[in-house]
Amino acid sequence: MYRWLVRILGTIFRFCDRSVPPARALLKRRRSDSTLFSTVDTDEIPAKRPRLDCFIHQVKNSLYNAASLFGFPFQLTTKPMVTSACNGTRNVAPSGEVFSNPSSCELTGSGSWNNMLKLGNKSPNGISDYPKIRVTVTRDQPRRVLPSFGFTLNSEGYNRRPGGRRHSKGNPESSLMWKPQEQAVTEMISEESGKGLRRPHRTVEEGVQKEEREKYRKLLERLKESGHGNSVCPVTSNYHSSQRSQMDTLKTKGWGEEQNHGVKTTQFVPKQYRLVETRGPLCSLRSEKRCSKGKITDTEKMVGIRFENESRRGYQLEPDLSEEVSARLRLGSGSNGLLRRKVSIIETKEKNCSGKERDRRTDDLLELTEDMEKEISNALGHGPQDEILSSAFKLRITRGDIQTLKNYHWLNDEVINFYMNLLVERNKKQGYPALHVFSTFFYPKLKSGGYQAVKRWTKGVNLFEQEIILVPIHRKVHWSLVVIDLRKKCLKYLDSMGQKGHRICEILLQYLQDESKTKRNIDLNLLEWTHYSMKPHEIPQQLNGSDCGMFTCKYADYISRDKPITFTQHQMPLFRKKMVWEILHQQLL
């Protein structure tokens, strides 16, 4: 009857005798491993020496075997520990799994329980490359993975966040696996709110050229709708660009002035520049000067569909596309050889055009000598802003006025009025039409004060003996030109932004009627007169927000010679330098 009890007790003592020598041998190897890998993770729990708990563990397993022999239900209240014979580490099984024999690599149980323990392959140094145990259970239970708590150098476990907090990565093979540091960093970046891969930010210059002219056009429309000519509205415009892309930074803020009944009243125009650039001086204009458009990023296009399409897409013109781009240089840079480069596209067209056309293009691309370029650079360089560089026509041009002719700067009244007087002096020569030019302050005063305010402006001048009358128009932040052709009895409004000026032409036509009746006592037949706003496709249009003053001056230059207007936007840098020399020497080239 008690024969089974004797067999069980004998089994207990036999297991205790067998487990002591292997445990000591494995303990030494485990202690060496723990010492070797203690630098990997200081928080890792070292393996303990099997003492009394090993005996208790064997007793419980023996009782379990006895219960299984007689068919009694028996469950362990604690988790049995399995000692791997391969690496000497102990694994704690989940509460739902029971091992019948912990001393071997293959565990077999009674009844329908059939558990198989699979260990990872050993590395040459005796350490398992994959320190995990797979247990396959055949009774409707999913396969479970039993990770080992003893990690090796090439094993995978926790990943650390930048803040020091740990987080584990899910893995169908192992829930505790260390990943290489490089891979962990990559996954961490990619999983945290998608910050791993970002599209690079577009540079400030990219796309500005495409929107430059459109923004300027919308500004003009908004100012036109905001009120009448006497309305006051501040403007602040900030444009950011870089030296390498042939753009500067200019912040314009302030007020302009207009003459009204002998008193200058404030009008919506910038009065002061604040220029930031790597070359050249800091330029600030006088507060009493009314300035045209400010320095804005250049959107000059090349001749041809290819360059025009690139500009529409917002791409910057590459400096190596053609020699024409090199001609768009900075004023004041001191480069002498750039102006003498021939534009390849224009040279090609010159071969196919007539002699008159070729002469006109050659005249526009007149080369400047080194002495001329040196003189221009000195005028645009450092120096007192109030220094007078040219004086004529009862006008004085200072260094600050000349520096408005730098690329991307807005021209002021003094520069435009001085240049218009140079046109009048040239047309006094034989072969040019009789020309009269009004000041830039004429139209604002006429509009605000009527004919009586400007009645004395033509004292000693008979307008009806002239052939062409030019009236520069300044509307808030934009320059345009009205051409009165007395030979054809017509008024034409030229705007580099394509705006219409019917109301301006009507005011000037009424002025001619009053002038004729006062000076000649003759009424004009207004039915014989026409006025017309030039359409954008009929005259060159500016492609940026800074060259409207230059376009106005060149409109006047070509019309005063009775020549068709054939210049383009890309010629503006050359025209600016030529105008500097012409003002300094008080003669046109």
UniProtKB/Swiss-Prot annotation:
Active site positions, chain numbering: H478, D495, C548 (nucleophile)
Task performed by this protein: Protease that catalyzes two essential functions in the SUMO pathway. The first is the hydrolysis of an alpha-linked peptide bond at the C-terminal end of the small ubiquitin-like modifier (SUMO) propeptides, SUMO1, SUMO2 and SUMO3 leading to the mature form of the proteins. The second is the deconjugation of SUMO1, SUMO2 and SUMO3 from targeted proteins, by cleaving an epsilon-linked peptide bond between the C-terminal glycine of the mature SUMO and the lysine epsilon-amino group of the target protein. May down-regulate CTNNB1 levels and thereby modulate the Wnt pathway.
The protein's assembly and partners: Binds to SUMO2 and SUMO3. Interacts with the C-terminal domain of NUP153 via its N-terminus. Interacts with MTA1.
Origin species: Pongo abelii (Sumatran orangutan)
Name under which the protein is recorded: Sentrin-specific protease 2
The enzyme's E.C. designation: 3.4.22.-
Keyword flag Protein transport: yes
Motif annotated as Nuclear export signal, chain positions: 317-332
Enzyme class: hydrolase
Molecular function terms, GO-annotated: deSUMOylase activity
Gene3D superfamilies: Adenoviral Proteinase, Chain A (3.40.395.10)
PTM remark: Polyubiquitinated; which leads to proteasomal degradation.
Alphabetical list of InterPro entries matching this protein: Papain-like_cys_pep_sf, Peptidase_C48_C
Keyword line: Cytoplasm, Hydrolase, Membrane, mRNA transport, Nuclear pore complex, Nucleus, Phosphoprotein, Protease, Protein transport, Thiol protease, Translocation, Transport, Ubl conjugation, Ubl conjugation pathway, Wnt signaling pathway
GO cellular component, one term: nuclear membrane
